[in-house]
């Protein structure tokens, strides 16, 4: 099958470089010392990106990013814990859903699809409910594209003597996530987002002292991050068959990440992409879901036009025929679609996308001006 190579303008999987793809051409023995060294290099680099080498450990886990979120919650939350979930989209809702499966007690602050959580409301609830031990927040809620104020939330949570878990799936690697400044108990992300690797594993950066205390908490053998970490520390190996090709590709992606200039350079490129995308789409007549101040450099949600000729399925296929894959909306109340700003793309690709959108509107006989 000769599959066309599209630009993936999504929050992950994303467009990867040819050299990242080529890194998957070799086979690796899962217990071989060479592969163990690749794993250790990856773990060390991720800790360095978060400025957390002295306080945290990196525990990779096979599967999607949600696997890593569930594993972290299941490992760190004991029966005596109660979680406050800050919810403003699908991924905050997913954390609550995981807690339902885990049978861990939780409460929510839900601010809907359009607004970030209010740190003052968080502080007030923590004052009122002494049984809350931990707070979970999504760094970038990609169902809307909103960037949540993790710095202000971290200050409130740490000031109240509670623990903070950050789902930084679509932000870590570009947005600041300094462990010393934010003081989080755990930060979770995956290979196929801002580091521009391919899907196959997620990872958690967890405070060493908390992980050491978490032995026996886990609800699942394969998702026991304490056991995964202890086994890696002892043997250098993954407990069960690792995604060898994905790890090798991620190691190459990390080399390219360093060559580009690490997080500041990546954030600058994604921000350029976002600014050009938003300006161009507005010029074509589209409106963003969010106010300017809440727009993230990861993904932007646009409102579907009211024109009766607009049909998202056709819009999607027309763009796909022109080489671009976008995302449908994930909102409950509003018809929308999403376009990502991350991956191995820069302003020339964004310009080509905008021309493709313009051509698609003409083909669909839609006028937004």
UniProtKB/Swiss-Prot annotation:
Q: Does the keyword Metal-binding apply?
A: no
Species of the source: Hahella chejuensis (strain KCTC 2396)
Molecular function terms, GO-annotated: 2-aminoethylphosphonate-pyruvate transaminase activity
Name of the molecule in the record? 2-aminoethylphosphonate--pyruvate transaminase
Source organism superkingdom? Bacteria
Quaternary state and partners of this protein? Answer: Homodimer.
Query: Which EC number(s) does UniProt give?
Result: 2.6.1.37
Q: Which gene encodes it?
A: phnW
InterPro entries according to UniProt: Aminotrans_V_dom (IPR000192), NH2EtPonate_pyrv_transaminase (IPR012703), PyrdxlP-dep_Trfase (IPR015424), PyrdxlP-dep_Trfase_major (IPR015421), PyrdxlP-dep_Trfase_small (IPR015422), SP_NH2Trfase/AEP_transaminase (IPR024169)
């Amino acid at each position: 099958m000769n599959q066309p190579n599209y630009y993936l303008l999504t929050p992950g999987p994303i467009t990867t470089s040819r050299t990242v793809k080529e890194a998957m051409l070799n086979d690796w023995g899962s217990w071989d010392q060479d592969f163990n060294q690749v794993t250790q290099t990856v773990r060390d680099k991720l800790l360095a990106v978060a400025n957390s080498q002295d306080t945290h450990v990196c525990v990779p886990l096979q599967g999607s990013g949600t696997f890593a979120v569930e594993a972290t919650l299941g490992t760190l939350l004991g029966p005596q814990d109660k979680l406050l979930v800050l919810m403003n989209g699908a991924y905050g809702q997913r954390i609550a859903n995981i807690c339902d499966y885990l049978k861990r007690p939780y409460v929510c602050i839900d601010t809907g699809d359009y607004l970030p959580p209010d740190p003052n409301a968080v502080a007030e609830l923590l004052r009122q409910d002494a049984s809350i031990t931990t707070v979970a927040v999504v760094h970038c809620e990609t169902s809307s594209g909103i960037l949540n104020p993790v710095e202000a939330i971290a200050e409130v949570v740490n000031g109240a003597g509670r623990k903070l878990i950050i789902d930084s799936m679509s932000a870590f690697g570009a947005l600041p996530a300094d462990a010393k400044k934010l003081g989080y108990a755990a930060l979770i992300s995956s290979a196929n987002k801002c580091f521009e690797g391919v899907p196959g594993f997620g990872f958690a950066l967890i405070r060493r002292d908390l992980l050491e205390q978490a032995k026996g908490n886990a609800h699942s053998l394969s998702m026991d991050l304490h056991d995964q970490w202890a086994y890696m520390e002892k043997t250098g190996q993954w407990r069960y068959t690792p995604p060898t090709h994905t790890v090798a590709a991620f190691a190459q992606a990390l080399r390219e990440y360093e060559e580009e200039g690490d997080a500041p350079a990546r954030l600058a490129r994604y921000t350029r992409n976002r600014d050009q995308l938003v300006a161009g789409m507005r010029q074509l007549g589209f409106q963003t879901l969010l106010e300017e101040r809440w727009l993230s450099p990861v993904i932007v949600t646009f409102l579907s036009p009211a024109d009766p000729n607009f049909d998202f399925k056709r819009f999607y296929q027309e763009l796909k025929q022109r080489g671009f894959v976008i995302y449908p909306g994930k909102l409950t109340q509003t018809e929308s679609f999403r376009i990502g700003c991350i991956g191995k793309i820069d302003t020339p690709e964004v310009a080509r996308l905008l021309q493709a959108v313009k051509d698609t509107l003409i083909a669909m006989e839609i006028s937004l001006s």
